[in-house]
């Protein structure tokens, strides 16, 4: 039974996901259904958390929109996600960047990771 579940999960994993780490800035394009219309919506933000659980993996992006912090959790292998692109690589020393929630302005900036 367990092997069947693992095989089904393996088939549903997306293969075209770029490698990213906390602190990186990503642009995620998501399919949004509004009534009868279906369109792509882009969300660009800093990765503040990653949860690696196979098919149930997720990551959290944070951006500041009109002075208000917006966080959105995406399921990594969701069929609603059209594409993920890395815009900028950030140099941080923690896996979870929840401290960015209390910061604003210059103190919320993340240095750019060079070389890698």
Swiss-Prot record:
Q: One biological process GO term for this chain?
A: translation
Membrane-spanning residues where?
A: none
Swiss-Prot/TrEMBL keywords: Ribonucleoprotein, Ribosomal protein
Q: Which Pfam families does the annotation name? A: Ribosomal_L19
Q: Which GO terms describe its cellular component?
A: cytosolic large ribosomal subunit
What InterPro entries does UniProt report for this protein, alphabetically? Ribosomal_bL19, Ribosomal_bL19_CS, Ribosomal_bL19_sf, Translation_prot_SH3-like_sf
Xref: PROSITE patterns: RIBOSOMAL_L19
- A GO molecular-function annotation: structural constituent of ribosome
Q: Which domain of life is it from?
A: Bacteria
What the protein does comes down to:
This protein is located at the 30S-50S ribosomal subunit interface and may play a role in the structure and function of the aminoacyl-tRNA binding site.
The UniProt similarity line reads: Belongs to the bacterial ribosomal protein bL19 family.
Q: What is this protein called?
A: Large ribosomal subunit protein bL19
